[in-house]
Amino acid sequence: MFSLKMRASRNGNHVSGAERLVNEEKIEKISSELIKRAMSHENGVPDFINLKIEKVTEKINKLKHLEIKTVHSTSKENSRNIARNLLKNELEKYYLKNGKDIEKIDELIDFAFKIIDAGNMRGAAILDLDGNRLENILERGIRVKNIDTTEELSEKILKDSSLTKRTVDAIAIATKVVNCGVISELCTSDNFSYTTGYVATNDGYFRILNLKDKGQVGGRVFFVENSKIDELYDKLENMPVIVY
């Protein structure tokens, strides 16, 4: 199989990115789709596109997708309270296990929302339980690479009219992230018009409507228990995963 990685930017600012794992005969077709995706992005036509094609020599790991659960909410305030509660329920277990003050969880989540609302990061921020940022380069964050879904899963998701290609991309990322040892993930889209975001934990992938306002930037935060950052980086960036 081959790994295809697309990155697009405009005036140095991130516009679009995507990852695929495909067989050799699909390289040309998927490459064309990725370039079209970059050129037609609602956030603007990029002035720089990078497409990297690389043969995968490692074993492909197959992971069962997180259960998809949609949470309906009509206001950003309510949606963020829902996301906060999902994150708190998961983080509390790790705070108690590590003897940390659970009253500090709200501060950690506040910091996470501040990060995603600031936007313009190519990758995700990583926060430990004390609120320390662990990315090697804070302005870039970490990108989850070498991922894809099976055609069967993609088709199954897209049969639901309420779900989109963004859901397919997100479920691949969320499933890999949780299986790499991340406690939970908070994400909003960098697409200005797409207001649905999500929280991912071992309990599932929770799509939350209206998690941000239209026209607002997006971002991604991973919550982690320990600081084995080099091991986590290696898994998130290099471990090939196909989600089914």
Curated annotation (Swiss-Prot):
Organism (species): Methanococcus maripaludis (strain C6 / ATCC BAA-1332)
Family, per entry: Belongs to the BioW family.
Pfam short name (any one): BioW
Domain of life per record: Archaea
Primary role: Catalyzes the transformation of pimelate into pimeloyl-CoA with concomitant hydrolysis of ATP to AMP.
Cited InterPro entries: BioW
Gene Ontology MF term list: 6-carboxyhexanoate-CoA ligase activity; ATP binding; magnesium ion binding
Pathway(s) where this gene product acts: Metabolic intermediate metabolism; pimeloyl-CoA biosynthesis; pimeloyl-CoA from pimelate: step 1/1
Protein name in UniProt: 6-carboxyhexanoate--CoA ligase
An example Gene Ontology biological process: biotin biosynthetic process
UniProt-listed HAMAP family: BioW (MF_00668)
Known EC number: 6.2.1.14
Catalyzed reactions: heptanedioate + ATP + CoA = 6-carboxyhexanoyl-CoA + AMP + diphosphate
Subunit structure: Homodimer.
Keyword annotations of the record: ATP-binding, Biotin biosynthesis, Ligase, Magnesium, Nucleotide-binding
Cystine residue pairs: none
Cofactor: Mg(2+)
